[in-house]
Amino acid sequence: MAFANLRKVLISDSLDPCCRKILQDGGLQVVEKQNLSKEELIAELQDCEGLIVRSATKVTADVINAAEKLQVVGRAGTGVDNVDLEAATRKGILVMNTPNGNSLSAAELTCGMIMCLARQIPQATASMKDGKWERKKFMGTELNGKTLGILGLGRIGREVAIRMQSLGMKTIGYDPIISPEVSASFGVQQLPLEEIWPLCDFITVHTPLLPSTTGLLNDNTFAQCKKGVRVVNCARGGIVDEGALLRALQSGQCAGAALDVFTEEPPRGRALVDHENVISCPHLGASTKEAQSRCGEEIAVQFVDMVKGKSLTGVVNAQALTSAFSPHTKPWIGLAEALGTLMRAWAGSPKGAIQVITQGTSLKNAGNCLSPAVIVGLLKEASKQADVNLVNAKLLVKEAGLNVTTSHSPAAPGEQGFGECLLAVALAGAPYQAVGLVQGTTPVLQGLNGAVFRPEVPLRRDLPLLLFRTQTSDPAMLPTMIGLLAEAGVRLLSYQTSLVSDGETWHVMGISSLLPSLEAWKQHATEAFQFHF
């Protein structure tokens, strides 16, 4: 299994001691060094397969490309914007996070910010420390009956909603992924963004920082908001346009803002932080003892479980690899890679469209995780840029000029009609289609271009296969082929044939090693190829 050779892990940011202990108890070597420069980080990674960071370490493309052994980057926290995901994916490096670790701490901070905004608690505290008694200046507003708009209804947004509902707030929200039915189950009515702005007394954001969410609150959206709206951002700097927020505060369109995050941290410009109606913190969303312990524990457990082949969770850039650890899906991943390898050997260097077709109830949603494995088989000996694996397969296949499509068929691929679950790989517009299935935990080849094998042909990583197609049985054919093997010093380990199809038969020989050339074979066969995956 991929990443099973992970042996040494660098922890480059401050983490709870439980992280190191769990890693060591799991059999991993651990090095802890913090406040490293880019050059020092690269030097430390030269003999490390794993890296665990919080938010301080910047895992840039330069770091990733220079770390020859690096296989996995773990972020002890939710956001991974300090990791260059594209560079990591291109190099086949797995990136994980701990999406649950700091959810409660971030949600509680958000709720505290909302309450502080409503009652101006930090400003009143500062006034008291300054020796003043200004009761009239700090007139607040009740939360009961007010409308809270929650943008992003994942783990943190959900926890915020539940807590603020207990204070009598009405919660509305928006999330392009969470369904309205799911959000309704925790008391949030979903609305289009243009309907949310004018309804909200308070707005809190809980989305990742993406091109689509950068500047989500801007001059245009502030203009659509209720006058005196209050805004909270404990998610990522940049989701709220800081210039637009300052202008809204200065005009009174926004009555107050609570910010735990900034576009630049620490912020060089002081206009927002110094504004009298702004509450700010130095990115404290995950800064609780419980969150730090939980994040350190979770990322360490994820590393150990991955190395032991037990499970893979928190994956950011390789859904297919997550599925590869499922007992049901794992052999199908192996089958998909085998069929991709077979297709490359059979069709040469295929171009154009590769079709990945699944059949059977349990494979209905498997196409998206099986297609990267097919790509691995297609490209693993052809890719000139990087070692191809389940992490970078979809990225590299486009550069190879291939378009891989997936579909699910209620009937057997190729209308062969055998078995409940099948996987077919075909080259669109060309006479190349291979069909396989899994028997127990063993991937097997069921058919080639409509020619069916009975029994099916086992596909084993330790068994090279020679496949050739001939006219209907010639008594002298088999002795001739065995003689050709002997001349090459190759032993015959197994032999199977397909049912006759269009007057021809496919033959499959398990052999002790791949043949140096197939020219002699092609004199006796319509076509011949060999492969080993």
Curated annotation (Swiss-Prot):
One annotated GO biological process: L-serine biosynthetic process
Record InterPro entries: ASB_dom_sf (IPR029009), D-isomer_2_OHA_DH_cat_dom (IPR006139), D-isomer_DH_CS (IPR029753), D-isomer_DH_CS1 (IPR029752), D-isomer_DH_NAD-bd (IPR006140), NAD(P)-bd_dom_sf (IPR036291), PGDH (IPR006236), PGDH_ASB_dom (IPR045626)
Chain positions with N6-acetyllysine modification: 21, 58
Pfam family, one: 2-Hacid_dh_C
Modified residues (Phosphothreonine): 78
GO molecular function, a single term: L-malate dehydrogenase (NAD+) activity
Glycyl lysine isopeptide (Lys-Gly) (interchain with G-Cter in SUMO1), cross-linked positions: 21
PTM-bearing positions, type Phosphoserine: 14
Pathway where it operates: Amino-acid biosynthesis; L-serine biosynthesis; L-serine from 3-phospho-D-glycerate: step 1/3
Residues recorded as bearing N-acetylalanine in the entry: 2
Active-site residues, as the UniProt record annotates them: 236, 265, 283
Reaction catalysed by this enzyme: (2R)-3-phosphoglycerate + NAD(+) = 3-phosphooxypyruvate + NADH + H(+); (R)-2-hydroxyglutarate + NAD(+) = 2-oxoglutarate + NADH + H(+); (S)-malate + NAD(+) = oxaloacetate + NADH + H(+)
Binding locations of NAD(+): 78, 155-156, 175, 207, 234-236, 260, 283-286
UniProt keyword annotation of Oxidoreductase present: yes
UniProt enzyme class: oxidoreductase
Superkingdom of the source species: Eukaryota
Keyword Amino-acid biosynthesis found: yes
Signal peptide: none
EC number in record: 1.1.1.95, 1.1.1.399, 1.1.1.37
Position of the Glycyl lysine isopeptide (Lys-Gly) (interchain with G-Cter in SUMO2) cross-link: 21
Keywords assigned: Acetylation, Amino-acid biosynthesis, Isopeptide bond, NAD, Oxidoreductase, Phosphoprotein, Serine biosynthesis, Ubl conjugation
Function, as annotated: Catalyzes the reversible oxidation of 3-phospho-D-glycerate to 3-phosphonooxypyruvate, the first step of the phosphorylated L-serine biosynthesis pathway. Also catalyzes the reversible oxidation of 2-hydroxyglutarate to 2-oxoglutarate and the reversible oxidation of (S)-malate to oxaloacetate.
Quaternary organization: Homotetramer.
Name of the protein this chain belongs to: D-3-phosphoglycerate dehydrogenase
Gene name per UniProt: PHGDH
